[in-house]
A protein has these predicted regions:
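Short, well-structured N-terminal submotif of metal-dependent ribonuclease cores
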Residues: 1-34, 40-52, 58, 117-118, ...
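Active-site neighborhoods of divalent-metal-dependent phosphate/nucleic-acid chemistry enzymes
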Residues: 12, 18, 59-122
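Non-catalytic, well-ordered alpha-helical scaffold segments
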Residues: 33, 37, 87-90
Length: 124
């Protein structure tokens, strides 16, 4: 299962990403409530339809506040330009065996690599 980050969704909604279309067709693309919340705050076409579709994908687990703080401390994630959503996504992927994160954020990619969280490969 692949957790798709917000920016990947934003770019897909502007111009369809063939790889994401394939993952969706194979039921391999997952979402997270915080990604849905971030997208809900933006201007997206067919807003209600898109948000409903995202909510019906596999939902990655939500980590608790204490779990995020432990992750930040244990993996020394502070001072790297990561946001709270980034830390939550990293933690969620770590909880799901075999899961990967698809992000285009360089800082989040680096944090995942250092934390042992698998990344989905970009396909050009």
């Amino acid at each position: 299962m692949i957790l798709v980050d917000t920016l990947v969704w934003i770019e897909h909604l502007r111009a369809a990403d063939a790889r994401l279309v394939e993952l969706l067709g194979d039921d391999e693309a997952g979402c997270h409530p915080l990604v849905i919340e971030e997208l809900a705050l933006g201007s997206i076409k067919q807003r209600d339809v898109v948000l409903d579709l995202l909510a019906n994908l596999y939902q990655f687990p939500v980590v608790t506040h204490d779990e995020v703080l432990r992750l930040v401390g244990r993996r020394r994630l502070w001072g790297r330009g990561l946001g709270a959503v980034d830390a939550n996504l990293l933690g969620s992927v770590a909880l799901v065996g075999g899961a990967r994160l698809w992000t285009r954020d360089k800082r989040l990619k680096a944090a995942c690599a250092e934390s042992g969280v698998a990344l989905a490969e970009e396909v050009s």
